């Protein structure tokens, strides 16, 4: 399934590139043809002086150059429109289509008045411009109206279809692309959670997450450096074992390129993930384990007992384990070590074991929303 998602992204990028080329070529040809049409209709004598073929060639190139920026503007607006309607549910899309058809029907009724009106018979340009203006206003107004009241209108017009569409939206849902937070990568449960297949769909690693890990890795603080290296190690393990599910932001194909390159300068790392996911037209599901928001990352229908088993404390009071003492603590005689997930372990009378791996027993656990600290003491004859 994930291979199919990646193939779909690659095909979408290829199709998007071909469509961009088509738009640009279309406007280049349109600009050249429109310029030649203006010359032939309004300035026919211009071709009588000099080389007619050369004049047409130069003017067509000039028309193409003028039409080129117009094509770029149209191309950008078309991409924005596609990303906007990609978020539509079936009911909104159906009612929007009906509103546009109804708006065009009402506009045609009004156009019949314009056709018989003697006032505008001599002003054809104003007549056609008025046609375009009325069509645009009615279509846009109907489109905006049903976007906010699609459920109500669909229940009135086609109640049977409204019920079927409601069931479709509730049952048939596309997999959600999730953002992997930095603190989530360095958490010791991340590998186990992937192994238990709680995470469905694609998982996106933003550039901000890589940058945060790099900052930690380059830090002079021992704990930060340890967490940075641990994060890169776990990220590499995830990419190796779940390469069909993990996607780096740089390889993403269906987002706004302008957003991806510009948002780093205006948002912090938390806001960048939100802008990134909204630009990819996906529901935002982001979590920070240290803030106990694990419920926002996964679907509601999950094995709660298994999730609790994964998220429980690694060691409880009275349990023992081996620990590498890496430095002195703040108080006299204390030694400091770290678990695999970066949890600080304070060892009473452990400063003399710096650089050694000893067996300790847990005396007390401090659990807070920001993390946990284990208080231990060495086991004699360990």
UniProtKB/Swiss-Prot annotation:
Q: Provide one Gene Ontology cellular component.
A: chloroplast
List where in the cell it is found: Plastid, Chloroplast
The UniProt transmembrane annotation reads none
What InterPro entries does this protein map onto? PIN_dom, TRAM_dom
Q: Which residues form the TRAM domain?
A: 314-375
The record's keywords, sorted A to Z, are:
Chloroplast, Plastid
The SS bond pairs are: none
Q: State the family it belongs to.
A: Belongs to the ycf81 family.
Would you tell me the protein name for this molecule? Answer: Uncharacterized protein ycf81
Name the gene that codes for it. Answer: ycf81
